[in-house]
Amino acid sequence: MENTRASLMFKTLAVAAIGLSATFVMLVRDPSDTLFGGGYPELWRRTGLAGAPTRAAACIFAGVFLLAMGWLYRLLFAPLELLRGVDEVGYIAEDGRSRAQAANEVRRRRKTGELPPVYPNGWYRVLDSHMLERGDVKSVTVLGQQVAVFRGQDGKAYVVDAYCPHLGANLAVGGRVVGGCIECPFHGWQFRGVDGRCVKIPYADKVPEFAKVRCWPSCEINGLVLVWFHCDGLEPSWRVPEQSQITRGEWVYRGRTEHFINAHIEEIPENAADIAHLAHLHTPGIVSGVDLRYTNSKTWEFIRHDWKVEWKPEPEPNKHCSQMLVKHALTVFGRHWPLLDLDVLARQVGPGVVFLLFEHSFLGRGVIMHCVTPVEPLLQCVSHTIFYQSSIPPLVPKFILRAECIQFERDVMIWNNKTYISKPMLVKEDSAIQKHRRWFSQFYSENSPRLRYQHDTLDF
C-alpha cells in the first residue's frame, strides 16, 4: 500500500508538471523571456531562435527533466522488479547462436541422470499477493498443471484448475469474477472458489451435483499466494509460518526477482548444504558479475566475500524445516570491513519456501522469501521477494536484493548446465550434502510423479 500511494503521488505530480509546462509554453510568447529575464534572450532573437524554436526547446527541457525525475523516483522509491526469461541467464551463446538456441542445445544434449520424483509434496508459491487485485484472474502453470488464480470480491484468493469441466475453456483467459466465483467465458458457468462447485448454469434449470472444478488447497500469507500439493491428495500436514512484521506492516514490499531454472527442484535447496561451493563460486566480489568465465578476473580480485556456513535439519515437530546459518564478511585489498559483516538465518520450510532473515546494526532488518515452484518436471520458477523495515530508505533493501541476485545467477549458470548425479563422489567435508538428501526425501511418497525414459524421449 505504501508503494501504491507513493506511485500515485508521483503520477499526480508528473501530470501536474506536464500540464503546467504545456500551459506555460502555449501562453507565454517567448518562454526564454520568462525563464531568463529580458536581457539573456536577446542572443536568441539575434540568432533567430526566438518564438517557436524556444518553445520547442522548453518542451524538450521539460521532457528530459520529467524523464530524469522518473528515473530518480524509480531508483530511490519504486520497488526493484527484475524478471529473467527462461534462456536469459546461464547460457553461453557462441558460434553465432542466440541464447535461446544455446539453451535448447544444452537441454537437448544434457544427460538427465537417475532422478528423484519431480514434484515433492508441499506448499508452493503461485503469485505474490500484490499481483492479484480484487476481481483479477491470472493464468499460472504450476506442477505441470494450468490453474486459474483469482481474487473474489470478498478479497480472498482462490486457486482452481484452469479448464472448465464443461467443454474445456480456460477460465483464466476471458473468465471474470462474480462475487466469490469465477465465470467461464464460454458458456457462463460459475464455479465457487471455496470448493469448486458450479453454482450457476445460465441456460439450465438445475445445476447437477457432479458439476465442479478441482479446487486447490491454498492460503495467502506473508504477501504470497501458496498452493498445497500432495500426490495422494492428502490435506496439508504443516503450514508455512507467518512473518509477523509483514502482517503488521512494519516490513514493506521492496521488490522481487524471478528466474527460470532448467534443473530438478532438489538441486536448488541442496546448495544450502553444499558448503564448499560458497568459497569457490561466491567469493569473488559482486562487481565481477555473473558470467563464470570472468568472475575470477584479476581486475576485481581485491574485493572478496568470505563465508562461514552451517546447515542442519530441525527436530520434531518441525522436521519439515531446516536451517542454514551464514556469516558473511567483506574484505577490500585484504582489509576486513566489520561494519559490512552480515549474519543471515536461512530457514527452509518444506521443499519450496525459504526465509532469508537479515539483521544489521545500521542497515536494518528484513526478509527475502526464496520460493521454488516446479513449472514442469525439470523447469523451476524461482522468485525472491524482499520485505524490509519501512523506516530504512528503499535503496538499501534494493541493493541487498540486487547483490543477492548477482550471487544467485552464478548458481543459475551451474544449474542450467549440470546433470543430477544420484550417487555423487563425495569427500568427508561434503557430508552435509548426504544429510540434506536424506532430509529432503521426506517430501516424496510412493506415488510421487517421476520422469521416465521411453525410446530416448521423456514421458511424464
From Swiss-Prot:
Residues that, per the record, bind [2Fe-2S] cluster: 164, 166, 184, 187
Catalysis performed (reactions): cholesterol + NADPH + O2 + H(+) = 7-dehydrocholesterol + NADP(+) + 2 H2O; cholesterol + NADH + O2 + H(+) = 7-dehydrocholesterol + NAD(+) + 2 H2O
Keyword Transmembrane helix: yes
Chain ranges of the Rieske domain: 123-227
Broad EC category: oxidoreductase
SUPFAM superfamilies attached to this UniProt entry: Bet v1-like, ISP domain
Main location: membrane
Pfam families reported in the protein's UniProt record: KshA_C (PF19298), Rieske (PF00355)
Gene Ontology biological-process annotations: cholesterol metabolic process
Keywords on record: 2Fe-2S, Iron, Iron-sulfur, Membrane, Metal-binding, Oxidoreductase, Transmembrane, Transmembrane helix
Topology in the lipid bilayer: Multi-pass membrane protein
Biochemical pathway: Steroid hormone biosynthesis; dafachronic acid biosynthesis
Cellular localization per UniProt: Membrane
CDD domains in the cross-refs: Rieske_RO_Alpha_N
Function, in words: Catalyzes the production of 7-dehydrocholesterol (7-DHC or cholesta-5,7-dien-3beta-ol) by inserting a double bond (desaturating) at the C7-C8 single bond of cholesterol. This reaction is the first step in the synthesis of the steroid hormone Delta(7)-dafachronic acid.
Name the record gives this protein: Cholesterol 7-desaturase nvd
Source species taxonomy: Eukaryota, Metazoa, Chordata, Craniata, Vertebrata
Gene: nvd
